Amino acid sequence: MKTKVAAIYGKRDVRLRVFELPEITDNELLVSVISDSVCLSTWKAALLGSEHKRVPDDLENHPVITGHECAGVIVEVGKNLTGKYKKGQRFVLQPAMGLPSGYSAGYSYEYFGGNATYMIIPEIAINLGCVLPYHGSYFAAASLAEPMCCIIGAYHANYHTTQYVYEHRMGVKPGGNIALLACAGPMGIGAIDYAINGGIQPSRVVVVDIDDKRLAQVQKLLPVELAASKGIELVYVNTKGMSDPVQMLRALTGDAGFDDIFVYAAVPAVVEMADELLAEDGCLNFFAGPTDKNFKVPFNFYNVHYNSTHVVGTSGGSTDDMKEAIALSATGQLQPSFMVTHIGGLDAVPETVLNLPDIPGGKKLIYNGVTMPLTAIADFAEKGKTDPLFKELARLVEETHGIWNEQAEKYLLAQFGVDIGEAAQ
């Protein structure tokens, strides 16, 4: 099977590649990858090349396919897997394999990654339960289940303690104060959505950022009134220019501090602020992955000793986290499409990945069977003045107030003749 992929050939070297995939073994799957949402972790891998812990050597001869937030359709089933999978079945990939090597789809494999028209899912990924049946029909939601899974996993990874009781209570503190720092970006939107609509029931959620435009957008998507209707106080704060943001933020809790803090940017000042905002037994989750292997900040160990403050770090999520993300999206409790601001085809991947931090907006969603430059949803109407494809896409997203939706996805895929398979039974 001939495939077209975006692959890492070295540091800051991402190219399109067309080649013949080998025949699958009896324990592998050949799949068509319909959609993949671009993760900042992919940019980090492209930036570092083989110096990244998950990226192997010899990229020049064996380039690795980018992308891991993907969903698609099974095209061919290995002989030993016919009782478990079938041709035409839709799937979503859970890429966190937890291997000692750190290897996973989108970083480490020549034939296994989300930015591909076709890829081979290897036996090891299948045995680890990474291929999940997808019962829905909206591939964007399936792709976005992976970033939502990471967000959900972070909430589950936090923990709290009782003095002299040597058991961790996993998850955020019920009825507690949550602070989401540097959290008005695409992943932050998902974190706010889950805090309000994920059923974890904090009493207060404070979202902190320094970008007015981003804060204004997320407030439209997730207004304070929505949170209030669920018994949650939601506060948006821009700390840019504040002389003492710590004092102001602690005042929102009566100076008690925050029980759970999530840091969504690998910026020393943000991590230090999080430390100062912790309540007694407060848990700081360092969600943002730094590219600097020597990333260090001061931390108050007096509070560690006397106030039981503590730190966790999370990367990825479990299969159960993924299933939760899919289920909450299917019921409409979570709206992962809120994160999406740009749509593009496979041809847009190299430039998108290499310039990802400099492209404004939220998640960039790629449809591999589509030829289309990366385009902001907000620009559809203007482009539609001269291009009938964008004219119809603009009309369809207008029905959901500028948010990407399943009808727009189906129209786009139909224009390029993409086979969307059938829902898992």
From Swiss-Prot:
InterPro entries: ADH-like_C (IPR013149), ADH-like_N (IPR013154), GroES-like_sf (IPR011032), NAD(P)-bd_dom_sf (IPR036291), Zn_alcohol_dh (IPR050129). Pfam families: ADH_N (PF08240), ADH_zinc_N (PF00107). One of its GO terms (molecular function) is oxidoreductase activity. Keywords: Oxidoreductase. To K.pneumoniae SorE. This is Uncharacterized protein YggP. It comes from Escherichia coli (strain K12). The gene is yggP.
